[in-house]
Swiss-Prot record:
It is found in: Secreted. The keyword Secreted applies. GO terms for cellular component: extracellular region. This is [Val1,Thr6]-bradykinin. Keywords: Amphibian defense peptide, Bradykinin receptor impairing toxin, G-protein coupled receptor impairing toxin, Secreted, Toxin. GO terms for molecular function: toxin activity.
Length: 9
């Protein structure tokens, strides 16, 4: 995954 990307918030 790209830095700073999160599938969970």
């Amino acid at each position: 995954v790209p830095p700073g990307f999160t599938p969970f918030r």
